[in-house]
Amino acid sequence: LLLFGAVQFAMVIHGLFKGESLSAMRAGGLVLALTGIAALLLPGAKAPPLYSALMMIVAGLAWAAYSVRGRAGQAAGASTAANFVLATPMALALSLLFMKQGHYDAAGIALSLLSGAAASAGAYVLWYTLLPSLGSITASTLQLSVPCLAMLGGVVFLDESLTVRTIFSALAVLTGIVMVTREKSPRQPMTKARKP
């Protein structure tokens, strides 16, 4: 919840700073989607330690910055590949630090590589492809669909139970997203340079 809250806060502030509009309908949709996320994730959750909470907030701000930067990108595939190359040394260094605390086998390593290099990379390329056509506020709200998709995947592939709470939470999120995306933010008029 801290992670999504940080992403929303940063990207909405960025959107408003850049001149995007936040009408009553869009604001209501944003609040409804966040309420749905809270209802989906909060029950049963415990307050994390301060350090863990700060790390989640930092991760949310980093993802917001990543998304904002992606709006100016031209080649989604090349940008994602470059980001993965730059992130690999950091990931390896962190893995070495925590190596003694984990358990490793061939299947786990292979699944991790498939998850990161295939599934995540494909999702990032798709996200970077869509971002240039989205405003910051719209993009931040669309990201709230991820927990709903993860929940659906758990039901379909892992036989997890589907409760009334999760159904209504997902409906609240999706309704909020529709409210935000249905009303398009007006583009800012471009000022023409005056001739001398």
Give the label of every model feature segment.
Residues 6-28, 148-167:
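C-terminal transmembrane-helix exit sites in multi-pass transporters
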Residues 13, 39, 54-69, 94-154, ...:
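Hydrophobic alpha-helical transmembrane segments of multi-pass membrane transport proteins
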Residues 19-27, 45-51, 74-77, 89-113, ...:
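Membrane-interface interhelical linkers
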Residues 22-42, 89-92, 153, 165-184:
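Hydrophobic transmembrane alpha-helices of multi-pass small-molecule transport proteins
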Residues 2, 6, 28-32, 54, ...:
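Hydrophobic residues within alpha-helical transmembrane segments
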Residues 65-87:
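Juxtamembrane helix-loop-helix junctions in multi-pass membrane proteins
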Residues 39-48, 100-104, 156-165:
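Helix-coil boundary and interhelical linker segments in multi-pass alpha-helical membrane proteins
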Residues 13-64:
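Compact, aliphatic and Gly/Pro-tolerant "microcore" segments centered on a short helix or tight beta-hairpin
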